[in-house]
Swiss-Prot record:
Broad class of where this protein is predominantly found: cytoplasm
Entry's Gene Ontology BP terms: DNA repair; subtelomeric heterochromatin formation
Residues reported in the UniProt entry to bind acetyl-CoA: 312-314, 319-325
Chain's gene name: hat1
Name recorded for this polypeptide: Histone acetyltransferase type B catalytic subunit
Family statement drawn from the similarity comment of this UniProt entry: Belongs to the HAT1 family.
InterPro entries for the chain: Acyl_CoA_acyltransferase (IPR016181), Hat1_N (IPR019467), Hat1_N_sf (IPR037113), Hist_AcTrfase_B-typ_cat-su (IPR017380)
Cellular-component GO terms for this entry: chromosome, telomeric region; cytoplasm; nucleus
Segments of skewed composition (Acidic residues): 553-563
Length: 570
């Protein structure tokens, strides 16, 4: 139905209209619902008057026509990697962003265009950018109503050299004589072959101007593909930049022309060194009143640190091909080889990255666990005290605590992450028939507990107790607020969710090993991670996520989440 609105007054009444505001950097919207199909109009065509919230429209518009001037930003933005060909640019790959809300607002809508295409071109080797905007028709300004200024909106997100004309950009890429000799900045740290294609991983300090220039060009990918991701500030003091290391993944391709580069970007990651205080307990502290000495200059790389992965991205055309595991393994190897690094951590990982990380760490630690015959002791008590009710979990009698601590510190894995991998391995050592996934009799286990006749049933019982113990310590502040019965129920539910997630990964690992045995292929532990465990936005492994988090929700939390959540974080 076409409505012509001319100097129309609407009274904000529950019977007449319901008004809801949504905020957006590109413009706010007022959503009207008054018995007719919902209409969406920009707030710039309405003005509010008085306490009665009367809306006064100053122009005539066909509302149905007006809605045709908005488009989905995710569909409008098109990212293209290009290489020089004989006469024109050759498209290597083209894809759309996963998110655009940091740039165009929470609604991810752009007003004022029909047939809009925002094409972001990047040279495949050095990411030289170019912004090109095309459309079929643009909204003509009516008073203060105008189409979104796209170049102005994108200016804070892309380098200045992206605002060149398409002919100038094509000429610059086609005539780039330096492309033939291009090498990624930094040093080569890892090479590998995947699906008969060659790849390299390069690492360099952010204090290097070439690394910084390449990262500046890639920064917009953070906002387009990493949920709640924040671009790095590359204008910090040099001593801060020295704490950052950037890893670039490149594919070695056949150059389309003699002057073209053989490198094509696949993804990148950034790591940051956090200072770690390690108290020297071998010496007794002594107070000295001597003047403060002016010692030699200390470089950040010489200080004890925790290495934290801040950003980790494989571009969509290369996801689900195993590049994420190779990149993570390269970072972990550098961490182990650096004597100043205490452990490797990850900044706010999503569940997709958790899958990749669990897969990589499991295959790194599994040979070490097997070597030392790590398993749960089914009889932690003496024979005469087995019938007594235990007052606490005998952790030291169940697993070799000192040995596991030494393994963790030697591989520099975060304590929480190490606990996940250990639980997964210990679960794999229990026969499937004695686990819940294999049809174990849980009722009998709850009755028999550690007094069960089968040692594997006792191992499974103690595995659940060890996992509950870790979950309770981690979520103690939440659990102590619950009644005892509800506390026990929440722990049981969470342990079952954790076990279910482990079973998914263990099944995937087992199937992969069977395929490799059938093909007669022997791979190194770091290379046996599933190719599907990339940190991308989609894939089989992300459809069956590892369930780790312990949450307690009430009705108010659910209502608030439904009202405020734009999208589910992954």
């Amino acid at each position: 139905m076409a409505l012509i609105l001319e100097r129309l007054y609407l009274l904000s009444s529950p019977r007449n209209a319901i008004i809801r505001n949504t905020r957006s950097e590109a413009g706010r919207e007022l959503i009207f619902s008054f018995g007719l199909p919902s209409l969406s109009l920009p707030s710039c065509i309405a003005s509010q008057y008085g306490k009665r919230r009367r809306l006064y429209f100053t122009t005539q518009l066909h509302v149905n026509s007006f809605l045709h001037w908005t488009c989905d930003a995710n569909d409008a933005v098109n990212i293209t990697l290009v290489q020089p060909d004989e006469q024109k640019l050759k498209t290597v790959s083209s894809f759309h962003p996963q998110f655009t809300y940091p740039i165009f607002g929470d609604d991810e809508r752009i007003f004022g265009y029909k047939g809009l295409i925002i094409r972001l071109r990047f040279a495949a080797h050095d990411l030289r950018p170019q912004l090109h905007i095309s459309y079929d028709e643009k909204f003509k300004p009516v008073e203060d109503i105008a189409a979104v200024d796209i170049p102005k909106t994108l200016k804070p997100w892309i380098p200045e050299d992206a605002f060149v004309t398409l002919p100038d950009y094509e000429k610059a890429v086609l005539e780039d004589k330096a492309a033939k000799d291009f090498k990624p900045p930094g040093k080569l740290v890892h090479c590998y072959v995947s699906r008969n294609r060659n790849f390299e991983i390069w690492a360099g300090s952010l204090a290097d101007p070439e690394v910084r220039r390449l990262l500046d060009r890639a920064q917009i990918f953070v906002s387009l593909f990493i949920e709640a991701g924040t671009p790095l500030a590359t204008d910090d003091p040099e001593w801060t930049l020295q704490r950052w290391t950037v890893y670039f993944v490149y594919e070695i391709v056949k150059p389309p022309t003699p002057t073209a580069s053989k490198y094509s970007i696949v993804g990148y990651a950034t790591t940051y060194r956090w200072w770690h205080y390690r108290r020297d307990r071998t010496q007794v502290p002594v107070v000295k009143n001597d003047p403060f000495p002016s010692g030699p200059e200390i470089h950040p790389s010489q200080l004890p640190s925790r290495l934290r992965i801040a950003q980790f991205l494989i571009l969509p055309p290369h996801q689900n091909s195993g590049h994420g595991r190779h990149l993570y393994t390269a970072i972990h190897s550098a961490c182990v080889q650096d004597p100043s690094v205490v452990e490797l951590t990850v900044e706010d990982p999503n569940e997709a990255f958790d899958v990749l990380r669990d897969s990589a760490d499991y295959h790194i630690l599994r040979p070490e666990f097997i070597k030392h015959e790590v398993n749960i002791n089914p009889d932690p008590y003496e024979a005469h005290s087995r019938n007594q009710r235990p007052r606490r979990v005998p952790t030291a009698a169940l697993i070799p605590v000192k040995l596991l601590h030494d393994i963790r510190t030697s591989y520099k894995i975060d304590s929480t992450q190490f606990a996940h991998i250990l639980e997964m391995f210990l679960l794999s050592q229990i026969p499937l028939k004695n686990r819940h996934a294999g049809g174990a009799n849980m009722s009998r286990l709850l009755i028999k507990k550690h007094r069960a006749e089968d040692p594997n049933e006792r191992r499974y019982y103690w595995w659940r107790m060890l996992t509950k113990q870790r979950l309770y310590k981690r979520s103690k502040d939440i659990l102590i607020q619950l009644d005892l019965d509800e506390r026990i129920q929440k722990l049981e539910e969470t342990v079952s969710n954790v076990e279910e997630g482990y079973e998914v990964l263990l099944k995937e690992f087992s199937e992969r090993e069977e395929k490799l045995k059938a093909r007669g292929v022997v791979e190194s532990p770091a290379a046996t991670v599933s190719d599907d465990a990339s940190a991308g936005p989609s894939g089989t492994s992300r459809d069956q996520r590892v369930k780790r988090k312990f949450t307690v929700e009430d009705d108010e939390d659910k209502v608030e989440e439904e009202d405020t959540a734009k999208r589910t974080k992954v």
